[in-house]
From Swiss-Prot:
Entries under Gene3D superfamilies matching the protein: Aldolase class I (3.20.20.70)
EC number: 4.1.1.48
Family: Belongs to the TrpC family.
Protein name stated in the entry: Indole-3-glycerol phosphate synthase
Amino acid sequence: MSNILTKILARKVEEIAERLLHVSQAELVARCADLPTPRGFAAALQATIAHGDPAVIAEIKKASPSKGVLREDFRPAEIAISYELGGASCLSVLTDVHFFKGHDDYLSQARDACTLPVLRKDFTIDPYQVYEARVLGADCILLIVAALDDAQLVDLSGLALQLGMDVLVEVHDIDELERAIQISAPLIGINNRNLSTFNVSLETTLTMKGLVPRDRLLVSESGILTSADVQRLRAAGVNAFLVGEAFMRAAEPGESLREMFFIT
């Protein structure tokens, strides 16, 4: 496990303990009973691909540990509207406070402003966070294989699916992919960023693509910065993408999305 991931997870344990002091897990469970049905996250991606278009998960991210603040003028609702107009199929919203300058409210603001399904992008290690994600309005959660053991992967993914959410299982190498395909989550995210060096290479997706079962949808994540990157991946049969940094640095995120994915 990388040094930065170790730090993030240690902080996450503290954060969960702090949140439990204010809202119990039992209270979150009770709230989940009265919520409307989630928007279909995997279904939205699959529908876009079936139409012949690239399925884009557009990310709303203020900052990252490696790059610092990406966008000073950060208005999640406006960004969400821009992404929907630009052709995004789904959204991803960072809610980690300490390392990514995210906030739970950013997810709610973004989701309320559009009709797109939303992924809660955070470091999920405990059932409490799965219930919390559902209460916040998330339609999908992220599970990072590098952060979890096999029992946690099974338990957390099963709980999310039971609550009606989808699960994006993120891997960085072949060993993690072999673990990921043992659970029934519909989405496999291949992160092109090396967690140890932070170097990014699209070869990670291209090398591992053939190992993803046909009944799972592969999502390529990180390092997709230009239309040439998109064309290279699409030529190899990759049809779903998670992109954040390139859009966050653009004056008009949705226009940047449209230019990267839909103007040839």
